[in-house]
Design a protein with these regions (language model features):
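Short acidic/glycine-enriched loop/turn segments that link adjacent beta-strands
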Residues: 1-2, 48-49, 81-83
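Short proline/glycine-enriched turn/loop motifs at strand-loop junctions of beta-rich domains
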Residues: 12, 57-63, 93-95
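Surface-exposed, polar helix/loop patches in the mature regions of secreted/periplasmic/lumenal proteins
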Residues: 48-70
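Ser/Thr-rich low-complexity repeats and stalk/linker segments
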Residues: 64-107
C-alpha cells in the first residue's frame, strides 16, 4: 500500500514523493518525483500514460487529488497543509476515461 504525497526538503524545495505504509503510518520512499518530472502511471504493471506534474509554493487550496481511469482510481495525491498545490497535470487527451478530481480543504 503506497501513496504519493508532498514533501519539503531541507533546502526548501518541494517534491512529490512516494510513501509506503508501514505499521499504520506512511513513510517516505526513495525515487522522489520532482517538480516538472514526467511521471509514468502504471496499472497492474501496464503503462497507461505519462503526465507532467508541478508544484506551486504558497498555494494550499487543494487538499487532495485523485487520478482516475474510468471509474477506477489509480493514484491519490495528498497535499500537506500549508505546503503547496499541484497546479498542472498534463494528461494526453487520446486516453479515454481519464479524470482528475480535486478535493478542496474544508476550512
Amino acid at each position: 500500500d503506497s501513496r504519493y504525497g508532498l514533501a519539503r526538503l531541507q533546502d526548501g524545495s518541494l517534491i512529490i514523493s512516494k510513501f509506503e505504509k508501514k505499521r499504520n503510518k506512511y513513510v517516505l520512499k526513495g525515487n522522489s518525483i520532482q517538480d516538472g518530472d514526467i511521471v509514468d502511471i502504471r496499472d497492474n504493471g501496464k503503462s497507461l500514460t505519462s503526465y507532467a506534474i508541478g508544484v506551486e509554493p504558497n498555494s494550499a487550496e487543494i487538499d487532495q487529488i485523485h487520478i482516475k481511469v474510468g471509474m477506477e482510481e489509480i493514484m491519490e495525491i495528498n497535499i500537506a497543509p500549508n505546503y503547496a498545490a499541484i497546479y498542472h497535470i498534463d494528461i494526453p487527451n487520446n486516453i479515454e476515461g481519464w479524470g482528475v478530481e480535486y478535493k478542496e480543504r474544508d476550512e
